[in-house]
Each structure stands twice: as structure tokens, then as C-alpha cells.
Amino acid sequence: MKKLLFSVVAILLFGSLSAQNVARECVLFEVFTGVNCPYCPAAANGISEMLEEGLAIAPVAIHTSAFSTPDFYTGETNARANFYGIGSYPTLKADGILTKAGGGNASQSMYSQYKAFYNQRINVTSPFTIDLSYDFVEGSVCQVTAVVNKVGQCDAANLKVMIALTESHIQRTWQGMPEVNAVTRDLIPTQNGTAFSGESITVTEQF
């Protein structure tokens, strides 16, 4: 059974945060991966174990043409990898800040390495709140709305909001694994995000 999951990502392209004062709900885990990557199963196992443990992560699997197939990667996901300059698979970007390259086969797991990153980030507060909702419009058309409010001080420049639409429980055998999870199907509105420079922004898109 396939399951659609929504993740909202506030991405700081430049600058840093200060006077952060709102507890975060989760840690963003962008994993650059592919079904043809022999070392990527350990990354997938690490993410699965963290979710099973109930840890507050937002996994976003970014498949690219480097190690995946056209049914999993898009021009947007390739662009996302180029943005970070990804050269090794798998590579984890935690909150867009911490980086861990490397993995293993289907009998191995990156859990301990990823958990260490989670522990570093989960208590880092944020100057933003994000509320996400979605509704069915008609037929197979949905509308997603993200409301971002600035509640603290932030000295970052070029701040952007991006919504990642992911799909999980795709029945596909790959590198000894039974299914593919958190596959990025769309970056809304695009991989460039929506510029945010004021106190509040509402992003509404249909897909």
C-alpha cells in the first residue's frame, strides 16, 4: 500500500539564525540516494529504525540520475543535489547543515551515525513556526498550504520556503531491500522554493 506524506522545509541558503526561541517539531533528514546504489540500503535502514523508534525526523529521499532510475528522480531532485554539491552516495544532510557520507549493504545500518546528528539538532530551537494543511480540490487534485511565521530574530539572507511531497511503501526490490520510502515526488513550487523576507508568508499550491 502506498502512502503519501507531506513535509515542509524552511531552508536557509545563506546566513545563520540567532535568538531562536521556539522548540522544533522535527529534524529534516535529506538523504541523497538511489536504487542502483549498493551502499544506500544502510541509509534507508537507519531512517527506518529512527522512525520505528518514534524519533521526530522528516525524511526526504532525494533520488538522482547518478544512482537511480527515471521513475524515482526528477529535474528538481537532480537540482537539489547540485545545490549541495553532492558527490557521494548515500549522503545525509541534516537540517541542511550537518553532512554524513557513506553507507552499507542491506544487512547494515547508519542508525548510530544518524542518531548522533539527530541528538545534535533536535534541541536547537527555531525563530519560525510552520503550519501545514492540505485539502482535496476535485478528482486527484490537491491543494497544500504552508503558513510560516517569524517569531524570533533571524539574520539569514535569501531565506526560502519549500514543500516536499514524498511517497512511501513503494513495492520495489532494490539492493536486497523490499520497498522504497520517502521518495521525493515534487518540490513545491520548484527546487528554488519561495522567497521569504517578512514576518509571515503563506504558500499555496495545487498538485
Identify the role of each PLM range:
Residues G15, C26-F29, P90:
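Short, proline-centered helix/strand-breaking motifs
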Residues N45, L55-F207:
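Short, conserved sequence motifs used for protein processing/export or organelle targeting and
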Residues L12, F32, V183:
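Residue-level signal for pocket-adjacent positions within structured domains
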Residues M1-R24:
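Bacterial Sec-dependent N-terminal signal peptides
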Residues Q20-I62:
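Local sequence-structure signature of Cys/Sec-based thiol-disulfide redox active-site neighborhoods
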Residues I11-L13, N36-Y39, V141, Q153:
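The N-terminal extracellular segments of secreted preproproteins, especially immediately downstream
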